[in-house]
From Swiss-Prot:
Pathway: Protein modification; protein ubiquitination. The gene is UBE2D2. InterPro entries: UBQ-conjugat_E2_core, UBQ-conjugating_AS, UBQ-conjugating_enzyme/RWD. The keyword DNA-binding does not apply. One of its GO terms (cellular component) is nucleus. It comes from Sus scrofa (Pig). GO terms for molecular function: ATP binding; ubiquitin conjugating enzyme activity; ubiquitin-protein transferase activity. Its EC number is 2.3.2.23, 2.3.2.24. Belongs to the ubiquitin-conjugating enzyme family. Interacts with SCF (SKP1-CUL1-F-box protein) E3 ubiquitin ligase complex. Interacts with CNOT4 (via RING domain). Interacts with E3 ubiquitin-protein ligases CBLC, PJA1 and PJA2. Interacts with PDZRN3. Interacts with PPP1R11. Interacts with E3 ubiquitin-protein ligase PHF7; the interaction inhibits cleavage of PHF7 and promotes association of the complex with the nucleosome core particle. The lineage of its organism: Eukaryota, Metazoa, Chordata, Craniata, Vertebrata. GO terms for biological process: protein K11-linked ubiquitination; protein K48-linked ubiquitination; ubiquitin-dependent protein catabolic process. It catalyses: S-ubiquitinyl-[E1 ubiquitin-activating enzyme]-L-cysteine + [E2 ubiquitin-conjugating enzyme]-L-cysteine = [E1 ubiquitin-activating enzyme]-L-cysteine + S-ubiquitinyl-[E2 ubiquitin-conjugating enzyme]-L-cysteine; S-ubiquitinyl-[E1 ubiquitin-activating enzyme]-L-cysteine + [acceptor protein]-L-lysine = [E1 ubiquitin-activating enzyme]-L-cysteine + N(6)-monoubiquitinyl-[acceptor protein]-L-lysine. This is Ubiquitin-conjugating enzyme E2 D2. Pfam families: UQ_con. PROSITE patterns: UBC_1 (PS00183), UBC_2 (PS50127).
Length: 147
């Protein structure tokens, strides 16, 4: 079941790739993918190329995939291990969701962080109290780690 669904999503991604994103299997392991997200133009991550790993559980799509950044990023909802605080990867997961929709949701999280549900409270505080500083540090990290 999982493998069939993963193959279908791979074909759908090839046919209709989401804007600024790509994803596919690492070698022959269909349960382990690598994804790339281009930093959105209307964000301090503009120009960066961010790599992520995707691990599908054996009971996918009934359980969410594990998605994490491997490229370092300064963001209130993404920690230094690359873990992402995004409701659809946890409690709001639905089998109707696809990797394409997950990647687009992560893209919109880069444009619009959620400082009220932070994984890194200190970055959330800076985002809320000093947006210029947040944007500056985000741009610096993007240049340092994602270019």
């Amino acid at each position: 079941m999982a493998l069939k669904r993963i193959h279908k999503e791979l074909n759908d991604l090839a046919r209709d790739p989401p804007a600024q994103c790509s994803a596919g299997p690492v070698g022959d392991d269909m349960f382990h993918w690598q994804a790339t997200i281009m930093g959105p133009n209307d964000s301090p991550y503009q120009g960066g190329v961010f790599f992520l790993t995707i691990h599908f559980p054996t009971d996918y799509p009934f359980k969410p995939p594990k998605v994490a950044f491997t490229t370092r990023i300064y963001h209130p909802n993404i920690n230094s291990n690359g873990s992402i605080c995004l409701d659809i990867l946890r409690s709001q997961w639905s089998p109707a969701l696809t990797i394409s929709k997950v990647l687009l949701s992560i893209c919109s999280l880069l444009c619009d962080p959620n400082p009220d549900d932070p994984l890194v409270p200190e970055i959330a505080r800076i985002y809320k109290t000093d947006r210029d500083k947040y944007n500056r540090i985000s741009r610096e990290w993007t240049q340092k780690y994602a270019m």
